[in-house]
């Protein structure tokens, strides 16, 4: 892969606090610059006031010329003046064969309530949580420059506990990603993708729920605008490929989600 860089960043003054705020996005991807397959990703996105998203990820494969690799990641999400959440990940990857990998690791979450007025009960609290995680992935490639990956399966499970100022309770989190390209012929194909996530707990906070919506999940909704304790999104596309560089596609997305805090169960499309 080539190195990639793309971004637009701006700044303005908040009318209420008079503080400097940033908006825009930044995407940086560095691949194999040290010639042993390493990858560094840096993503930042902010819309000025409502939310900020930061992600940094380092992948070091084949440590000491073995099938073992190391992955570290930091994510920070801030929703206006309501809360901020960070999660830190470290996991060891084992390359079973060219298409399959397994993972073992540790993940920690930390979230802070940013509200100045705590008299309004919106189920946001400070909390920390710690998890042991295990996962596996399978990737199949194909001879296509535009769509080099034909199918992918990725499963992650996290077992641990959440601690607030009042309680400590066990939690289980799981995520599944699957997609497949059905090649009708060289120019025509159908793309299907499913992304499912769930958290099981005795109680729930808004700032620990999954967030989805936007171009990377269900298109047509604002990014990260939907909070869910469980969701499943199905993306489908019909693709027509003109050549190795250009294609057009249709979009049909479906989703189902549950929010245990509001007892909401809803379908989206």
Please tell me what each predicted stretch does:
Residues 22-29, 41-43, 55-57, 151-269:
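C-terminal transmembrane beta-barrel domains of outer membrane proteins
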């Amino acid at each position: 892969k080539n190195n990639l860089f793309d971004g637009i960043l701006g700044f303005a003054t908040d009318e209420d606090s008079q503080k400097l705020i940033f908006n825009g996005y930044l995407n940086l991807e560095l691949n194999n610059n040290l010639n042993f397959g390493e990858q560094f990703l840096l993503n930042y996105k902010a819309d000025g006031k409502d939310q900020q998203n930061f992600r940094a990820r380092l992948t070091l494969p084949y440590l000491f010329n073995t099938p073992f690799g190391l992955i570290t990641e930091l994510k920070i999400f801030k929703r206006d003046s309501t809360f901020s959440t960070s999660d830190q990940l470290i996991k060891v990857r084992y390359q079973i064969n060219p298409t399959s990998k397994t993972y073992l690791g540790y993940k920690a979450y930390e979230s802070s309530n940013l509200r100045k007025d705590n008299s309004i009960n919106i189920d946001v609290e400070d909390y920390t949580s710690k998890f042991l995680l295990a996962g596996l992935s399978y990737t199949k490639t194909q001879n296509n420059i535009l769509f080099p990956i034909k199918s992918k399966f990725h499963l992650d499970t996290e077992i641990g506990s959440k601690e607030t100022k009042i309680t400590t309770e066990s939690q289980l989190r799981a995520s599944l990603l699957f997609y497949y390209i059905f090649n009708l012929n060289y120019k025509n194909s159908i793309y299907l993708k499913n992304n499912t996530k769930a958290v099981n707990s005795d109680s729930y906070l808004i700032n620990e729920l999954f967030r989805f919506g936007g171009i990377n999940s269900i298109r047509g909704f604002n990014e990260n605008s939907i909070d869910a304790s469980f969701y499943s999104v199905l993306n489908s596309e019909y693709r027509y490929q003109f050549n190795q560089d250009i294609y057009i596609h249709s979009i049909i997305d479906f989703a189902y989600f549950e929010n245990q805090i509001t007892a909401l169960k809803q379908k989206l499309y």
